[in-house]
A protein has these predicted regions:
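An acidic/histidine-cluster motif and surrounding catalytic segment
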Residues: 1-128, 137-174
Length: 174
């Protein structure tokens, strides 16, 4: 399983579109804060419907913008080595932005996602949902390595809400 970092990533992946340094907080038609999701890919893997699914499934406290980046395994290996000291590809990494209105980036390894989907016996689009949700929870401050099961409980509830049967934390226990 991947991990999280507090380092800003937009500069590191160069995936986020250039824009102003200050971001406005996304709101719905009623002016209520909401989650805005942008999905970008540097390869052939696409994720139709992932942004909308994550917006509907995310916990209520998820407010602001998040970028979900689908990258080659080689790129996530570089990021994993740089930020976590692990010279291997992982499935998902989360990088909190630390700026108002922007939660951060969830980076998913396309090849790892394909392999894990095959092993789990489901479509790669399902795997992308599992990974994106897991990464988003890290952006919101959850840490399954230190929180005595709190993240696992939240992930399980949201996963059911979004129609998924198992999440990364349960898989990691097998």
């Amino acid at each position: 399983m991947g991990g999280s970092s507090r380092a800003g990533l937009a500069v590191q992946t160069r995936l986020a579109p250039p824009g102003p340094k200050t971001r406005t907080r996304p709101t719905n038609a009623k002016g209520r804060a909401m989650l805005a999701v942008d999905v970008v890919s540097t390869g052939r893997l696409r994720a139709p419907g992932l942004a909308g699914w994550l917006q509907v499934t995310a916990p209520k406290k998820a407010r602001g913008a998040v970028t979900v980046a689908l990258v080659p395994d080689t790129r996530i290996r570089q990021l994993n080595a740089r930020y976590r000291g692990k010279n291997s590809a992982t499935d998902v990494l989360s990088f909190a932005a630390g700026e108002p209105g922007f939660l951060g980036e969830v980076v998913i390894a396309s090849g790892v996602a394909r392999r894990q989907a095959r092993q789990a016996g489901h479509a790669v689009q399902v795997e992308l949902r599992v990974l994106a949700l897991h990464g988003l929870l890290h952006l919101l401050g959850y840490d399954h390595e230190r929180d005595d099961g709190r993240m696992a409980r939240v992930e399980r509830r949201l996963r059911r809400k979004g129609g998924l049967r198992e999440g990364l934390i349960e898989r990691g226990r097998q």
